[in-house]
Structure formats: structure tokens, C-alpha cells
């Protein structure tokens, strides 16, 4: 499947290059004009954007992987240049975020619903791109942009994936293909498994798309520069090759796949159950069980399209598989071209009984197989050129089917094949079908639908690859069935919204995963009952699993990443549950033939994907406008519009192109900055929008004082404190203070805090994350977004309804009375409650009125004189019934970018604020108590 996101920034790409190419072919153009153009073109090719950094950070916790890819580019040319970011990701993964930084503009991805009407068109395009460009088991993400001359760009891609256990190992693959050598290239993988890590290996870099058979694979060790640190439950793997080491691997920058395989410890019991914040996951993978007998039918395309290498490789693989069959196993081979032929098996005399048993199912099985594929072609493929001759004589696309199951078959039942519960004891059960498509023109969507209808698996083999070894590898995954008809039950009073609990087969080396919600978060024990068939006997183990007290979730990703819409939920088990549920809804939608049912499944899958920020066939990604820097804050007031290109986004999983012009267009800022703020030494400004009044005041605090700026701990859960620092000694004659630290505490939905200084941002939501302020980055953690614009400002967005902007004021050569310091602006207060308090928070929902008219006609001379010193006439302001004397002043905000008129309240805002200045002093930066307002008790 091709994963494509086209982001067209700026004017039409390569216009100049196209014109030059046309001019070269013009016979009337003089040779003297051609040479300079050719030289210029060669220079452009030589000075293509330089990739300064390519890094991948992945965190795997309990099989669930969070991965963030960061790529930074530099345009060294004297003109704008096109650049493309390309990344291969696992086909099973969901993209959760994409962010671009072009120059100083930040474009943030947003997952939205996809319009249903474009589904048919998109489906065709998706199939085409998948077949032509898609890697086996991977999707390709592409994003293009235009980098201004001498400027930088950065791309951040985040995706999530649940690792599947195959052949006794979990495999985590990271594509390292930056397309050029990079001075800073790194892959950092953290693995956290509470059950304990039983084995861990890093494979050599793999540049082939094939998975391999797992038999006798290369064991030459990890790539050079790989460092592995491991203990019982945690492992850290770092791959950080130098430019020389990269060049030895591949001079074109296509290093290959960095692959980690590991397994965990298991107890011989009901399985491993983990619980966190009301969600649970159950890993079930028993071992040391006797294998079940299996019946294998190979359905092979014997038409002319298979003649040659593909047929030879397939035959070699089948002979290898036949030698692997156990004495109790049965097999048959069915070939088809324009007719169907059944080859009877030729076991030795000891297998004659099994041979006779198989003969009884040949005819009905062939009929069932033919009917299934005819219906699949009619519904999923609809390609008339693939139907030849009579109605049931058809030619599929080079598709060999390997069809094993875990039961003895003595006929075919009428029950629906994918529901094992519809096959009671003693009744024949359906086969498990392994559908393998060989070639680049396989209709993979058809195979997926057939697999879902028959509880099967689907695999792809490309023509240029070693099909034989891959066929053996696919067979190895299902060669040893241990259980059948597995059903896992939990008490309905304890568990709701569980994922699939019925499974037709369990194979050695695989794993069954179930996730769901707990009704009672304080549950001590969870009753689990497993019903399964093992070699003609039904096994029913029951037990009460202790779940213990549940701890608060942690942000396990621990890496700087774009996001901020909560897509990286600290509760990894909740994310795992949403991932599995979405996958099952998509599979049910693909399998269903009932239109009302398909629409219901589509709506459920779409709603869940939007809620958890998953990019699926039913959702698309759009880019929000750029986040303004401090030096561009005036744009929010309409003084100047930021001219930027409107990106055109194509859904990565098949959504149509979003409408939008390619020409430049003014952007609406994502956040409209209000005047309610505190900055400088420290100067407070509060807005009363209902009265169209702006009031300002100063607080003359002492160095070390911690001021309560916003206090809404009891309602929205947000508290903001600011710590003062004094001017250097022997400086200005007046004592000056500035904010050196802004602390933001969030109590809902999870407790976390931010500590911001002019040099760094510390984010602690369970795991500690330190961001330098001299680098632009966007990170997020369940409803909290932190956007750092290098040496300019920090924007904090909480639950999408609260936003703060903290400007960073740095001085190259500070005067004696200057210090590096911070400001604080309330950009969005919608999510703060009416009970919000603090030096700034108390004014967010209040009104004020001016009770005396300033500067009457007889006061014009006095007014003019006062204007010369920056002050105007006095008046009386009424706030909360209190009379506050104020004087008209002019004050600069936004680091001097804008000058405002305000009414100034003297004496530390006496009578303007509730209580006194000392009532707003916090005992420490993380104090959430308040002596004023509704929260009278002080909480430490």
C-alpha cells in the first residue's frame, strides 16, 4: 500500500526547470545562451537541499510501539528549492501525526473525517499505487515542500504499531533510507517489557523486501556502531553510524531496514494480563503443547503465467513443505488454469488411511473453493478481463493458495466459516486459508477479503524475490497448530468493549492478544476462562488473575516529537485497545457484504480513528496554519498578514486531495494572542473585552517571590506560577525584577507539569523530558502540546481550549539592569472556569467600567503635558464594586512590537486585585493552593 501525503507549498514546482528544459530543445537558440543555463542547472543539482539530521526514536512498551521520525534539511542555494521527505513505515502501523517546519513556520497535522463520496475513486488510486510502488509489508509516506533560499526545514512523522509475534519473536523494523548521507543519523529504540526480556537480537541491515524463512538466516551480527544496553525488563538499542560508516554500507544513503527481534518470558498459565487506568490487555501464548494434526491443500495456478522461475520456486518450496509434514498430517494439491485438476496424494503405505480420509473431501472442497473465489471476484475485483470461458472457468492473478487447518475434515458444514462457535463438537470446521499472491499485479485487496471470509492469512511475494524461501517462511508460521476453537471469556460485569475473543487456531510461536475496558477500576482480581480444543480434547482452564492497584499512566514515548492533540496517550494500554478495535472494525467492514452494516462499521471505525488520531482509510490528514513566533505576534492583530502557501494534503491511506489553491494565500493564525499578559519588570496588562477597556499595573516584588498568575486547580486543573529574579547588583538605581521561571501545573486528565526557563523546558508527565529553547520542536502528551520556537517563545496548549504563550527575552550584551527573562500571555482562556483566579486569572470573566470621563475640554492643556511624559488624566475604574483610581498611560507589549493604551492602577494594583499582593505569593513553584477565590485551603 502506498502511503502518500503530497504537501504542495509555494508556486508550481520546477517551473523554471521546465522552461529551461524546453529552451534547450529549441533549435533557434544560440549556443552562447545554452552554456550558462546548463551550468546553472548543474549547480542546482549539486546544491540540492542538504539533510543535516535524520533520527528515529522508538519506544516499545508491552509490544506496543511508538515511533517518531525527524528529518532536518538545509537549502544552501540562493533560490527556493523543492524537497521531498520519504519514509517507509510498516503496513500495519497507524500514522498519528505529521508536522512540518518551513523556515520559522510550523504546520501541524490534524486527523479529520474523510468524505465518503470520494471512496470509489480513491480506492482505485490506492490499489494502483500499492501495487506499483508499495513494499511488501510496508507503506511509503511522501511529503514535499519548498524551502526558501538559505533556510531550513524539518519534518516530523509519528506512527504507532502493535508488534505481532511470529515464529516465536517480535520484530520491530525501522526504515533507514534518508536518500543521502547525513552527518547526524541515529536510531534509538527503547524496549520495556514488564514480563522480562527473554531474548534480544539486532539483525544486519536488510535492504530486501522479503521476510525470509527464518531457517538458516544470516547471523553476522548487528550493523556497525550499534550499542545495546539491556537488563531484565528494559533494553536500549542505539544505531549511530558516522558518515564514513554510512558510505561503506550504501553511498546513496539507502542503508536498509534496522531490525530488532526479541521475545519475553512467559509463565505456563492463563497468560499475562496488564491493567492501567481502567484498561487491560491479555497476552495468551501457551507453549509445550502437542501439535494438532492438519490437513493441507495447495491450490496452485498452473497457467502459462506461472511458467518459468515462479513455478520452479513454488515447486521447490512445496517439496520442502511436504517433507515437513508429520505422519498424522494430510495433504492434497489442486491445480487450475482454464480447468481444475486434483492431484491425489501419494503417501507410503503407513499413510494410506489418511489418504482415504482425504479423498472424501476433495470434491466438495473444490466446489467450495470455486464458489468462494467466484463470489470474491464478483464483489471485490470486478475485472471482466479476468473471467474466461464458462461462468465458473476463471483465471485469477498468479495466486497460489496454501490452505491448511487444524482439524480433521470429513465434509463441509453450512455454518459461516469465520465463526468457530457455529461449529459445535463433532461437526466439521472450516479450513484456515493462507493466500499467497506472487507477482506485482496481484489484487491484494481480493486476497484480504478472501482471507477474512475464511479465517485466513494473506501474504505477498514480489516477482524479483526468492519466492521459494518466502513460501517456506509463510508456511512455518502455521506449520504447528497447538489449539483450535479458542474462546476466552471474562465476566460481563467486569469487562466491557473487549476486542475479539474467539479464535479458530493458535499456532506455535504466535500470540493471541485481547484488550478491553474494566467496569471497576478498583478491581483486585479478574476471572478468566479459556476454552479450547487440543488434540481431540477440550481444555477449559479457569483462574482469577490478580490485577493489583492500578497506577497512573505515564508518557512512555519520552522523545521530542510533533503532536499535541493527545494522539500519544500516556495510557499505552488504552492506545493498544483503540488500535485493535479500529483494526477489527476495518476488517469487518471489508468482509461485510451488507450495505447498512458496512455503513455502521464505517461510522464506528471513523469515529474511533478521529478520537485517537489514527490515519485510516476513513480519515484524512490536513495541516493547520503556522504557529506564530514572538516577532510575528503582531500578525494576530491584522497589522500584517503572514503570507504563506496553502498546503494541499492527500490522505495517506487513500483520501482524496483536499481542495485548496496552489497560490500563496494569507494564513489565519492558529492562536489569537490577547493582551492579558505579564512581561518585563513585571508589567501586567488585563483586557476587559465587554467594556473595551485595557487596564495595566505593576507588581514590585522581591527576588525569589513566586507569583500566582492563574489559579484554576479545582475546575480545569490548571495553575500557573512565576518566579522572580532581581537585576544584577550595582545596576540600575531602581530595584527591578523579572520572571526567570514559569511553572504550569496540569491536574486533568493526568497530572503533569511544565517548568520553563529562558534556556530550557522541562515536561514531566510521568517521564521527564527536557527541551532546549534554542531548537524548534513540538511535543505532546495526552491533551498537552508544547511548541518551542527557537530562542523566541514557547506555546503551551492544554486540551485544545487553553493556550499560553511564553516569550523568551535574551540579550547578547545585557545592560546592568537587564536579565534573560520570560513573559506570559494568555492566548486562549476558553477552557478556564468562571472561578479562575490569580493575578491574571481573576480578570478573565470580569467586567469593569470607567465612572469618570477623562480629559474634559478644560483639561486639554494638562492632557497634552501629561502625554509628553507618557501619562494622561486620572479617572476612576469600578471593578467588582470597588473604586480604583487609574491614570491613562501608553505601554508596549509583545516585546515592543505593539503599543497599547491602558488605564494604569498604582500601588501594586491596590483595590484592583482581590486582597493584597502577599495573598498571591506561592510557597514553592509547584504550589497549587490559593488563599483567595473558591479554593480557600492551600494544597501543597
Swiss-Prot record:
Subcellular location per the Swiss-Prot or TrEMBL entry: Secreted
InterPro entries associated with the record: ITI_HC_C (IPR010600), ITIH (IPR050934), VIT (IPR013694), VWF_A (IPR002035), vWFA_dom_sf (IPR036465)
Which Pfam families would you find in this protein's record? ITI_HC_C, VIT, VWA
Where does the record say carbohydrate is attached?
Answer: 97, 127, 231, 508, 774, 793, 860
Per its record, what are the GO molecular function terms?
serine-type endopeptidase inhibitor activity
GO CC list? extracellular region
Give any single GO term for biological process.
hyaluronan metabolic process
Q: Which residue intervals define the domain VIT in the entry?
A: 35-161
* Signal peptide (UniProt feature, chain positions): 1-16
| Residues covered by the VWFA domain | 295-478
The residue ranges flagged as biased composition, category Basic and acidic residues, are 407-417
Region annotation (Disordered) maps to 117-136, 208-227, 405-432, 541-571
Which keywords does this Swiss-Prot/TrEMBL entry list? Glycoprotein, Protease inhibitor, Secreted, Serine protease inhibitor, Signal
What does the UniProt function comment say about this protein? Answer: May act as a tumor suppressor.
Family membership, please give it.
Answer: Belongs to the ITIH family.
**What's the protein called, per UniProt?**
Inter-alpha-trypsin inhibitor heavy chain H5
Give the organism, scientific name.
Answer: Pongo abelii
Its gene name is ITIH5
Amino acid at each position: 500500500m502506498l502511503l502518500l501525503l503530497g504537501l504542495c507549498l509555494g508556486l508550481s514546482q520546477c517551473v523554471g526547470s521546465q522552461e529551461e528544459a524546453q529552451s534547450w530543445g529549441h533549435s533557434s537558440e544560440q549556443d552562447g545562451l545554452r552554456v550558462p543555463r546548463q551550468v546553472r542547472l548543474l549547480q542546482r543539482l549539486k546544491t540540492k537541499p542538504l539533510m543535516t539530521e535524520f533520527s528515529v526514536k522508538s519506544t516499545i512498551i508491552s509490544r506496543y510501539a511508538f515511533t517518531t521520525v525527524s528529518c532536518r534539511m538545509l537549502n544552501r542555494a540562493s533560490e527556493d528549492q523543492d524537497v521531498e521527505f520519504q519514509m517507509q513505515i510498516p503496513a500495519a502501523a497507524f500514522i498519528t501525526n505529521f508536522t512540518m517546519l518551513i523556515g520559522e513556520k510550523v504546520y501541524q497535522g490534524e486527523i479529520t473525517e474523510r468524505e465518503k463520496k470520494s471512496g470509489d475513486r480513491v480506492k482505485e488510486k490506492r490499489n494502483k499505487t500499492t501495487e506499483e510502488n508499495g513494499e511488501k509489508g510496508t507503506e511509503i509516506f511522501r511529503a514535499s515542500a519548498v524551502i526558501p533560499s538559505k533556510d531550513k526545514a524539518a519534518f516530523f512523522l509519528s506512527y504507532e504499531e502493535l508488534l505481532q509475534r511470529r515464529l516465536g519473536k517480535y520484530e520491530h523494523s525501522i526504515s533507514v533510507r534518508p536518500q543521502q548521507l547525513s552527518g547526524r543519523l541515529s536510531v534509538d529504540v527503547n524496549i520495556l517489557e514488564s514480563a522480562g526480556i527473554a531474548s534480544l537480537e539486532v539483525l544486519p541491515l536488510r535492504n530486501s523486501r522479503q521476510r525470509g524463512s527464518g531457517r538458516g538466516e544470516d547471523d553476522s551480527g548487528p550493523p556497525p556502531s550499534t550499542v545495546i544496553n539491556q537488563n531484565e525488563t528494559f533494553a536500549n538499542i542505539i544505531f549511530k553510524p558516522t558518515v564514513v560508516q554510512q558510505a561503506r554500507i550504501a553511498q546513496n544513503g539507502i542503508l536498509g531496514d534496522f531490525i530488532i527481534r526479541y521475545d519475553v518470558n512467559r509463565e505456563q498459565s492463563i497468560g499475562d494480563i496488564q491493567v492501567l487506568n481502567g484498561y487491560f490487555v491479555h497476552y495468551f501464548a501457551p507453549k509445550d503443547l502437542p501439535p494438532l494434526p492438519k490437513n493441507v491443500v495447495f491450490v496452485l495456478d498452473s497457467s502459462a503465467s506461472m511458467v518459468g522461475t515462479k513455478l520452479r520456486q513454488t515447486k521447490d518450496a512445496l517439496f520442502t513443505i511436504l517433507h515437513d509434514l508429520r505422519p498424522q498430517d494430510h495433504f492434497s494439491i489442486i491445480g487450475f488454469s482454464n480447468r481444475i485438476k486434483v492431484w491425489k496424494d501419494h503417501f507410503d503405505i503407513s499413510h494410506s488411511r489418511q489418504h482415504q480420509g482425504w479423498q472424501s473431501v476433495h470434491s466438495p472442497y473444490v466446489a467450495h473453493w470455486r464458489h468462494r473465489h467466484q463470489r470474491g471476484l464478483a464483489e471485490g475485483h470486478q475485472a471482466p478481463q479476468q473471467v474466461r470461458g464458462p461462468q465458473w472457468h476463471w483465471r485469477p492473478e498468479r495466486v497460489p493458495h496454501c490452505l491448511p487447518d487444524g482439524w480433521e475434515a470429513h465434509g463441509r458444514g453450512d455454518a459461516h466459516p469465520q465463526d468457530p462457535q457455529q461449529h459445535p463438537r463433532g461437526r466439521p470446521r472450516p479450513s484456515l486459508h493462507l493466500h499467497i499472491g506472487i507477482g506485482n499485479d496481484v489484487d491484494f485487496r481480493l486476497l484480504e477479503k478472501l482471507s477474512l471470509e475464511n479465517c485466513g492469512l494473506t501474504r505477498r511475494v514480489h516477482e524479483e524475490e526468492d519466492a521459494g524461501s518466502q513460501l517456506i517462511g509463510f508456511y512455518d508460521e502455521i506449520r504447528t497448530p497447538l489449539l483450535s476453537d479458542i474462546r476466552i471469556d471474562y465476566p460481563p460485569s467486569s469487562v466491557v468493549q473487549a476486542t475479539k475473543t474467539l479464535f479458530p487456531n493458535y499456532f506455535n510461536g504466535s500470540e493471541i492478544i485481547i484488550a478491553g475496558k474494566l467496569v471497576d477500576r478498583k478491581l483486585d482480581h479478574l476471572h478468566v476462562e479459556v476454552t479450547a480444543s487440543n488434540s481431540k480434547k477440550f481444555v477449559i482452564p479457569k483462574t482469577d488473575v490478580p490485577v493489583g492497584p492500578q497506577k497512573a499512566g505515564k508518557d512512555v514515548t519520552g522523545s521530542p516529537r510533533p503532536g499535541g492533540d493527545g494522539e500519544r496517550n500516556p495510557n499505552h494500554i488504552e492506545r493498544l485497545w483503540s488500535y485493535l478495535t479500529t483494526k477489527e472494525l476495518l476488517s469487518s467492514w471489508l468482509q461485510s457484504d451488507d450495505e447498512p452494516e458496512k455503513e455502521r462499521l464505517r461510522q464506528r471505525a471513523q469515529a474511533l480513528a478521529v478520537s485517537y488520531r489514527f490515519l485510516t482509510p476513513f480519515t484524512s490528514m490536513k495541516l493547520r496554519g503556522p504557529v506564530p513566533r514572538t516577532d510575528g505576534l503582531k500578525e494576530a492583530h491584522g497589522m500584517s498578514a503572514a503570507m504563506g502557501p496553502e498546503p494541499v494534503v492527500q490522505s495517506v491511506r487513500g483520501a482524496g486531495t483536499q481542495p485548496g489553491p496552489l497560490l500563496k494565500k494569507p494564513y489565519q493564525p492558529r492562536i489569537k494572542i490577547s493582551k492579558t499578559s505579564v512581561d518585563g519588570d513585571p508589567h501586567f496588562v488585563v483586557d476587559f473585552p465587554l467594556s473595551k477597556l485595557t487596564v495595566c499595573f505593576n507588581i514590585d516584588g522581591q527576588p525569589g517571590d513566586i507569583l500566582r498568575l492563574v489559579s484554576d486547580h479545582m475546575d480545569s486543573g490548571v495553575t500557573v506560577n512565576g518566579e522572580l529574579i532581581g537585576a544584577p547588583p550595582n545596576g540600575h538605581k531602581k530595584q527591578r525584577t523579572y520572571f526567570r521561571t514559569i511553572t504550569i501545573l496540569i491536574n486533568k486528565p493526568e497530572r503533569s507539569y511544565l517548568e520553563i526557563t529562558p534556556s530550557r523546558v522541562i515536561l514531566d508527565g510521568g517521564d521527564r523530558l527536557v527541551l532546549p529553547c534554542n531548537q524548534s520542536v513540538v511535543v505532546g502528551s495526552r491533551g498537552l502540546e508544547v511548541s518551542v520556537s527557537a530562542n523566541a517563545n514557547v506555546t503551551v496548549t492544554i486540551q485544545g481550549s487553553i493556550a499560553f504563550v511564553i516569550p523568551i527575552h535574551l540579550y547578547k550584551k545585557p545592560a546592568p539592569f537587564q536579565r534573560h527573562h520570560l513573559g506570559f500571555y494568555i492566548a486562549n482562556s476558553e477552557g478556564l472556569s468562571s472561578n479562575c483566579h490569580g493575578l491574571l486569572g481573576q480578570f478573565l470573566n470580569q467586567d469593569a467600567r470607567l465612572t469618570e470621563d477623562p480629559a474634559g475640554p478644560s483639561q486639554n492643556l494638562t492632557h497634552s503635558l501629561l502625554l509628553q511624559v507618557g501619562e494622561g488624566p486620572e479617572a476612576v475604574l469600578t471593578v467588582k464594586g470597588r473604586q480604583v483610581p487609574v491614570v491613562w498611560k501608553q505601554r508596549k507589549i509583545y516585546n515592543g512590537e505593539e503599543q497599547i493604551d491602558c488605564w494604569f492602577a498604582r500601588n501594586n494594583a491596590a483595590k484592583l486585585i482581590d486582597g493584597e499582593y502577599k495573598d498571591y505569593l506561592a510557597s514553592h513553584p509547584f504550589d497549587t493552593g490559593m488563599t483567595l477565590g473558591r479554593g480557600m485551603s492551600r494544597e501543597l
